[in-house]
Curated annotation (Swiss-Prot):
PROSITE patterns: SBP_BACTERIAL_5. This is Glutathione-binding protein GsiB. It holds the Pfam family SBP_bac_5. Residues 1-26 form the signal peptide. Belongs to the bacterial solute-binding protein 5 family. The complex is composed of two ATP-binding proteins (GsiA), two transmembrane proteins (GsiC and GsiD) and a solute-binding protein (GsiB). It is found in: Periplasm. Part of the ABC transporter complex GsiABCD involved in glutathione import. Binds glutathione. The gene is gsiB. InterPro entries: Peptide/Ni-bd, SBP_5, SBP_5_CS, SBP_5_dom. Keywords: Periplasm, Signal, Transport. It comes from Shigella sonnei (strain Ss046). The keyword Transport applies.
Length: 512
């Protein structure tokens, strides 16, 4: 009798164990392999798109952008703008809670915009909000934002990934450490952040949208090596990978369990030249370097065809972008210009990269070889996020070691101001923003400022074109390519995709 009871107990235990294993297997856990590490989980203090993309796990804004970079309501229901373009009145959704149980309301919006617009906080994204004069909570669901002057792109600023709503209680509790303790209204909350290895987020049970999220967890894992990232997808260690090494795209397409996606982007890759330093202060040198780079060949060598040669300084899908005749590859012309500029034997310089992943390494090697053919010896350095923050973003013109700098920019507002002002306006030299060419032109500054004071599309077009015409002629950059975004995912993962600004959309993601 005792033996029979023992056996049935074992059977019951076995069934229970099997059920537990089945439940564990059925958990909807997704691993996402990404190209670099995260700098912070505070969107207002992140300069990189990836950190802001991961922060969307926890955070939402009043507005957002869809796959076509069109404005959509998120925590806001609607907005109005005063006739003088100074006052924005935003109506908020009701009944939304932060992940710490506190209410999302107008007071919370005020707390976030007050923090963002206060220069004393030294937040990296301060320049997005410096035009805010004051924010008022009119009632729990109504916010009035008054600007210092008309700024026609302001609603796009509120849709930028940096403009996240953080719990005021968490801001009070954690202060400057909020970047390690995210608390928002988003679909996921922080589980673990191993700063050298991964960020894991888990489902927020109190999320305000019914039926969401559908995943139990997402683990964001930085994997710098392109081939390793692709291998993780093939072995099942990851369910989503971005960016995919272009040279492996064809191989992954043949895998019946993987879906490869190539989507449009607003990511422009370029090399800035520090125009305050010799020899790049000479326009003929800058012109020569533009002739020295074979962009169609670069598209094939570094991007395996998943890019197009740049035809301007603003990607074509951004509002008010202008296109120009692409720079032809002409090394003979490049040598002639260098000779005219006083460098018949070329010169030596440095070429830094903002990233150290495999594609960036290929771009550096290709560019180094191209420059060598016209007599320019470039010492290349591929930086990690920490090096970039310290050596490029953190130093002003006098102490900066930047000469040539390979990087990329995606104007996450979808509008030309954010594609031009941070990169070319005189007031936006590092460490303020990202004008790593240290370019300055009063006419350009004036045109950009005037464009923000008008809501007339025809006038904005005229002003932005005038600014871009000057920049294209003076060539503080070597515009290279506009990328196509190549990602891959397990076919049983749905609703997870790349935004044109290289961010992620995953609110509706599910494992089938």
């Amino acid at each position: 009798m005792a033996r029979a009871v023992h056996r049935s107990g074992l059977v019951a235990l076995g069934i229970a164990t099997a059920l537990m294993a089945s439940c564990a297997f059925a958990a909807k856990d997704v691993v996402v392999a990404v190209g670099s590490n995260f700098t912070t989980l505070d969107p207002y203090d992140a300069n990189d798109t990836l950190s802001q993309a991961v922060a969307k796990s926890f955070y939402q804004g009043l507005f957002g952008l869809d796959k076509e970079m069109k404005l959509k309501n998120v925590l806001a229901e609607s907005y109005t703008v005063s006739d003088d373009g100074i006052t924005y009145t935003v109506k908020l959704r009701e009944g939304i809670k932060f992940q710490d149980g506190t209410d999302f309301n107008a007071v919370a919006v005020k707390a976030n915009l007050d923090r963002a617009s206060d220069p004393a906080n030294h937040l990296k994204r301060y320049n997005l909000y410096k035009n805010i004069a004051k924010t008022e909570a009119i009632d729990p669901t109504t916010v009035k934002i008054t600007l210092k002057q008309p700024f026609s792109a302001f609603i796009n600023i509120l849709a930028h990934p940096a403009t996240a709503m953080i719990s005021p209680a968490a801001l009070e509790k954690y202060g400057k450490e909020i970047g390690f303790h995210p608390v928002g209204t988003g679909p996921y909350e922080l589980d673990t952040w191993n700063q050298t290895d991964f960020v894991k987020v888990k489902k927020f049970a109190g999320y305000w949208q019914p039926g969401l999220p559908k995943l139990d967890s997402i683990t964001w894992r930085p994997v710098a090596d392109n081939n390793t990232r692709a291998a993780m997808l093939q072995t099942g260690e990851a369910q989503f990978a971005f960016p995919i090494p272009y040279e492996q795209a064809t191989l992954l397409e043949k895998n019946k369990n993987i879906e490869l996606m190539a989507s449009p982007s607003i990511m422009q890759r370029y090399i800035s030249m520090n125009v305050t330093q010799k020899p790049f202060d000479n326009p003929k040198v800058r012109e020569a370097l533009n002739y020295a780079i074979n962009r169609p060949a670069l598209v094939k060598v570094a991007f395996a065809g998943y890019a197009t040669p740049a035809t301007g300084v603003v990607p074509p899908s951004i509002a008010y972008a202008q296109s120009y005749k692409p720079w032809p590859y002409d090394p003979v012309k490049a040598r002639e210009l260098l000779k005219e500029a006083g460098y018949p034997n070329g010169f030596s310089t440095t070429l830094w990269s903002s990233h150290n992943h495999s594609t960036a390494q290929k771009v550096l090697q290709f560019t180094q070889q191209q420059l060598a053919q016209v007599g320019i010896k470039a010492q290349v350095t591929a930086m990690d996020a920490g090096q970039r923050a310290a050596e490029v973003e953190g130093k002003g013109q006098k102490e900066s070691g930047v000469r040539m700098f390979y990087t990329g920019w995606s104007a996450s507002t979808g509008e030309a101001d954010w594609a031009l002002s941070p990169l070319f306006a005189s007031q936006n030299w590092p460490p303020t923003l990202f004008n790593t060419a240290f370019y300055s032109n009063k006419q350009v500054d004036d045109f950009l400022a005037q464009a923000l004071k008008t809501n007339d599309p025809a006038e904005k077009t005229r002003l932005y074109k005038a600014a871009q015409d000057i920049i294209w002629q003076e060539s503080p950059w070597i515009p290279l390519v506009v990328e196509k975004l190549v990602s891959a995912h397990s076919k049983n993962l749905t609703g997870f995709w790349i935004m044109p600004d290289t961010g992620f959309s995953f609110e509706d993601a599910d494992l089938q």
